[in-house]
């Protein structure tokens, strides 16, 4: 109930302000601040873009959230956790069918910066593979807690993905 109200208020405020919502366009038009050639940290001033993103799902709130977004004609980027994807693969397919972007938020939501290269690779690639099996190509990786290092960037680059904070 509180989540739905918060989403309605935020969505209405954005729409009333006349802000365009374009999930995932930060790297497409060069408007983002890029670090190490692959990590998008923030949008440039004056770009008139707003990215609406949700992390840690899919969850019990995802279907209601999708309904609210659909009613308002809004698309968003959902950064999903692999453990949750295994329990709700049908929601991932529906999210994509409804025009939302799907991003990788690692398999178990661990702080990547504190993991070995192999453990980071496993956290990221296992989600990429789960998504591929569902017909989803994830162009963006959002490290949990915003924690990443040069190894994370290299793994993302090898996957053809960008780090998106």
Outline where the language-model segments fall.
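Bacterial N-terminal signal peptides that target proteins for export
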Residues: 1-13
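N-terminal regions of proteins, emphasizing targeting and processing segments when present
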Residues: 11-13, 23, 72
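C-terminal segment of classical bacterial N-terminal signal peptides
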Residues: 17-25
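His/Asp/Glu-enriched short active-site or ligand-binding loop at hydrolase and phosphoryl-transfer sites
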Residues: 137-139, 147, 152-165
């Amino acid at each position: 109930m509180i989540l739905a109200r918060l989403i309605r208020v935020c969505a209405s405020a954005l729409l009333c302000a006349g802000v365009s919502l374009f999930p995932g366009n930060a790297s497409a038009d060069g408007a983002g601040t890029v670090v190490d050639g692959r990590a998008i940290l923030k949008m440039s001033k004056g770009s008139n873009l707003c990215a609406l993103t949700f992390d840690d799902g899919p969850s019990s709130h995802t279907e209601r959230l999708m309904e609210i977004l659909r009613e308002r004609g809004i698309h968003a980027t959902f950064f999903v956790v692999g453990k949750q994807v295994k329990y709700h693969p049908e929601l991932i397919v529906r999210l994509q069918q409804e025009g939302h972007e799907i991003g990788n938020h690692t398999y178990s939501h661990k702080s990547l910066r504190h993991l070995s290269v192999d453990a980071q690779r496993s956290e990221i690639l296992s989600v990429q593979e789960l998504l591929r099996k569902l017909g989803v190509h994830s162009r963006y990786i959002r490290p949990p807690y915003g924690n990443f290092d040069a190894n994370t960037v290299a793994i993302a680059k090898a996957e053809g993905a960008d780090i998106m904070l």
